[in-house]
């Protein structure tokens, strides 16, 4: 029986690349995508003629629940903090009548791990603390629910715990994604791109405080490979491992930090500055130290992105899915990222 997949966020950067990777690998899937824009729906179908459009938004909760109930695999690539929509998807999967397990794959960032820095108002400082998604998972899940994303995450994990014979779940926490997307969005506005934009518009690079905070990152196509591997595993409805450290799906496992590198924000600022100078876009190589409040005024939430530590280590994808990232490191993509931001600013 052909598996039915329902996806939200398919016109975005992460979701768009994942759908491209999935249908390139397995065009036989029956994929339905929630899309609110008629123009984007037309463009998505033009790229993927087999995709069925579900016209609606994340606020159409009954629509989401019904779509999930009629699917085998639900992929939430949309708003990670929109708890009502995630809960509706979970509720729909819990009542589905199709044979086999229903699967819910939820995407979010790794920003929940900045809790200590935020509470202590510690910005731009180094932290030795590194979270991992296998042996360290209990510690990860014990981080207080201060972030809006935690509510949606808990809704995902709860439906799997309460319905173990019917629903399996995976939470995919991505590092800062970079690289050219193959969906409708080639490059998204991320904290990395915002740092480049501010560097070009101000004529010099900047960092928060001492610039020693660090964040993990991941090449977009390597990230999509994780989604394809999860969906393939779900399609086969394979038996999950009883070993918590190797389990693919929720309960005691099913939690993934997906990353293939780390950037220290001050070091990244220097690399951006060097690239911008090399392209003749700025004159000097000075790096300005700013405080968290100014960072927030320059780019939304970038006081947290540029100033806090989200140091995580992904182990589960390699163990449970045999995932091996092969994409170029972030520094190799800076030339193109700087060029793209310069074009947006009319500098090239």
Swiss-Prot record:
Matches recorded under Gene3D superfamilies: NAD(P)-binding Rossmann-like Domain
Keyword Oxidoreductase recorded: yes
SUPFAM superfamilies: NAD(P)-binding Rossmann-fold domains (SSF51735)
Gene inactivation effect: Leads to the accumulation of a shunt product in which a double bond is introduced between C5 and C6, thereby scrambling the existing stereochemistry at both positions.
Pathway the protein acts in: Mycotoxin biosynthesis
Alphabetical UniProt keywords: Oxidoreductase
Pfam families named in the record: NAD_binding_10
MF GO annotations: aldehyde dehydrogenase (NAD+) activity
GO cellular component assignments: cytoplasm
The EC number(s) this enzyme carries: 1.-.-.-
Record carries keyword Ribosomal protein: no
Job description of the protein: Oxidase; part of the gene cluster that mediates the biosynthesis of UCS1025A, a member of the pyrrolizidinone family that acts as a strong telomerase inhibitor and displays potent antibacterial and antitumor properties. These compounds share a hemiaminal-containing pyrrolizidinone core fused with a gamma-lactone, giving a furopyrrolizidine that is connected to a decalin fragment. The polyketide synthase module (PKS) of the PKS-NRPS ucsA is responsible for the synthesis of the polyketide backbone via the condensation of an acetyl-CoA starter unit with 6 malonyl-CoA units.
Protein family (similarity comment): Belongs to the avfA family.
Stated name of the protein: Oxidase ucsJ
Organism: Acremonium sp
Lineage: Eukaryota, Fungi, Dikarya, Ascomycota, Pezizomycotina
């Amino acid at each position: 029986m052909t598996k039915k997949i329902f996806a939200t966020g398919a016109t975005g950067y992460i979701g768009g690349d994942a759908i491209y990777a999935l249908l390139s690998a397995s065009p036989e899937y029956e994929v339905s995508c929630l899309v609110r824009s008629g123009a984007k729906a037309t463009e998505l179908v033009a790229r993927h003629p087999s995709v069925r459009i579900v016209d609606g938004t994340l606020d159409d909760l009954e629509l989401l629940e019904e779509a999930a109930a009629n699917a085998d695999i639900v992929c939430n690539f949309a708003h990670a903090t929109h708890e009502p929509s995630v809960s509706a998807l979970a509720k729909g999967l819990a009542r589905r009548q199709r044979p086999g397990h229903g699967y819910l794959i939820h995407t979010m960032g790794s920003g929940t791990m900045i809790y200590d820095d935020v509470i202590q108002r510690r910005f731009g400082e180094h932290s030795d603390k590194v979270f991992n998604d296998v042996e360290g998972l209990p510690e990860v899940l014990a981080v207080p629910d201060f972030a809006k994303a935690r509510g949606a995450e808990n809704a995902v994990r709860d439906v799997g715990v309460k319905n173990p014979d019917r629903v399996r779940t995976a939470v995919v926490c991505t590092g800062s994604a970079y690289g050219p997307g193959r969906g409708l969005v080639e490059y998204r506005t991320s904290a990395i791109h915002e740092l480049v934009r501010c560097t070009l518009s101000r004529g010099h690079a900047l960092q928060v405080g001492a610039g020693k905070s660090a964040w993990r990152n991941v090449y977009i196509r390597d990230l999509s490979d994780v989604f394809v591997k999860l969906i393939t595993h779900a399609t086969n409805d394979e038996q999950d491992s009883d070993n918590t450290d190797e389990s693919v799906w929720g309960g005691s496992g099913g939690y993934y930090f997906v990353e293939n590198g780390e950037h220290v924000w001050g070091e990244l600022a220097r690399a951006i500055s060097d690239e911008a100078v090399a392209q003749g876009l700025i004159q000097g190589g000075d790096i300005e130290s700013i405080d968290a409040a100014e960072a927030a005024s320059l780019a939304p939430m970038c006081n947290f992105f540029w100033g806090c530590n989200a140091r995580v280590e992904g182990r589960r994808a390699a163990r449970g899915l045999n995932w091996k990232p092969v994409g170029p490191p972030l520094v190799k993509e800076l030339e193109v990222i700087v060029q793209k931001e310069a074009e947006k600013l009319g500098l090239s």
